[in-house]
Regions:
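C-terminal accessory domains and tails appended to enzymatic cores
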Residues: 35-44, 55-59, 64-182
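Active-site beta-strand->loop->alpha-helix modules in alpha/beta enzyme cores, enriched
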Residues: 1-35, 42-44, 50, 61, ...
Length: 182
């Protein structure tokens, strides 16, 4: 099993608190008799991964897993577009662009906005590691990626376990990306 959450250094307090909650609660998943009426379903800690972010303090994101999502990028954009309040109400408001999306705005324009947000958030992966990605994912467009950092509070998975959790992903070796980090 796996949990994906934000790192505890995120800009949004809900993200930070969720991260802390995951870390605090994850251990209790394997503690016997914590909730007598709900015995643990397993004695194994889940793998906990942090989703990519661009924050540098107090610690830069460490890419452990790289996943090329070129083939499913459009599906991701469409799925995220269903999160109406975040992507079409408050996010545009925070950057003083609340008039860009109205109730009458068509789906294509909405999807374009979501794509812009995703490119802003995840674009640095393909920009910063472009040369490396050509080697890691030969024959791919190498435009759209997700990256994950394995959280030290969860299970520390073997490569064979990661391959099951992230089919087709590239798993970095310690220090492998250091020369690309700015």
């Amino acid at each position: 099993d796996m949990i994906i959450t934000h790192r505890p250094y995120d800009y949004h307090r809900d993200h930070r608190y969720t991260s802390q909650l995951v870390m605090d609660a994850s251990y209790m998943l394997i503690v016997p008799h914590y909730f007598g009426e709900f015995p643990p379903q397993t004695r194994e800690m889940p793998v906990i991964c942090y989703a990519f972010d661009k924050f540098k303090n107090p610690k830069p994101f460490q890419i452990d897993v790289l996943l090329n999502i070129d083939d499913i990028y459009e599906e991701k954009v469409k799925a995220i577009a269903h999160h109406e309040s975040q992507f079409f109400e408050w996010l545009p408001w925070t950057i003083q662009m609340e008039n860009i999306i109205t109730e009458e705005t068509d789906l294509d324009k909405r999807l374009e906005l979501v794509g812009m947000v995703l490119n802003n958030n995840f674009g640095p992966i393909s920009e910063q590691y472009f040369e490396f990605l050509k080697t890691a994912f030969p024959g791919k467009k190498n435009v759209s990626f997700e990256a994950f950092e394995i959280c030290e509070y969860g299970k520390q998975p073997k490569k064979s376990e990661l391959k099951k959790l992230f089919p087709g992903a590239y798993f970095t070796k310690p220090g492998e990306l250091d020369k690309y980090n700015k």
